């Protein structure tokens, strides 16, 4: 099992998005006497979130798509737990100028989320497709280039490849529990249940 990432580890972002976040953190640290708290949530899901909705819609259409053959270790946080962490960071004493990872405290394999989605959607039959990373990389590169030439934006680009190719998303939330008083309230199963119920109630599915 891969080691947990901690807030004290040296950051090595592999996407433009991650690099922009790191630069923002570095800038904040250069401002003297500025009171700030940095939260680093892992995979955020819940009502209105669209990236994981795409997975739910795909499963409702009988396709479960995954990439890479090496097992992933993934972490998630339900949006309500993230809000809890944000609110606690506003009032917790002595946490200024600190960074915290936020998750539900558990580590999951790459099928955990899709299996829970499938259960909440009534266990539809599935065609499971697992593409090799080289194929995903080629698709993301070609699609990103075409959209860039056409002046369009796309989420299927080299950044997305690096996100999906990452195998270790484990993180240490002990400091958030100890210093913020953060306590995850939602298991992945509970969060997925609420999320799918919201999708259905608002006719997303």
Model-assigned labels for residue ranges:
Residues 1-43, 64-68:
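Catalytic helix-loop patch of NAD(P)-dependent Rossmann-fold dehydrogenases
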């Amino acid at each position: 099992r891969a080691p947990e990432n901690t807030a004290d580890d040296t950051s090595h972002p592999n996407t433009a998005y991650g690099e922009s976040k790191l630069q923002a953190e570095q800038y904040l640290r250069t401002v003297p006497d500025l009171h700030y708290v940095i939260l680093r949530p892992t995979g955020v899901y819940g009502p209105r979130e669209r990236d994981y909705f795409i997975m739910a819609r795909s499963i409702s259409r009988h396709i479960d798509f995954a990439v890479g053959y090496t097992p992933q270790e993934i972490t998630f946080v339900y949006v309500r737990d993230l809000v809890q962490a944000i609110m606690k960071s506003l009032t917790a004493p002595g946490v200024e100028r600190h960074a915290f990872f936020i998750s539900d405290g558990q580590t999951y394999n790459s099928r955990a989320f899709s299996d829970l989605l499938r259960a909440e959607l009534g266990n539809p039959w599935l065609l499971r497709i697992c593409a090799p990373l080289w194929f995903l990389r080629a698709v993301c590169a070609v699609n990103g280039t075409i959209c860039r030439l056409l002046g369009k934006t796309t989420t299927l680009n080299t950044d997305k490849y690096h996100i999906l190719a990452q195998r270790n998303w484990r993180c240490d939330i002990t400091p958030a529990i100890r210093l913020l008083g953060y306590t995850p309230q939602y298991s992945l199963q509970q969060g997925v249940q609420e999320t799918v119920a919201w999708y259905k109630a608002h006719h997303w599915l």
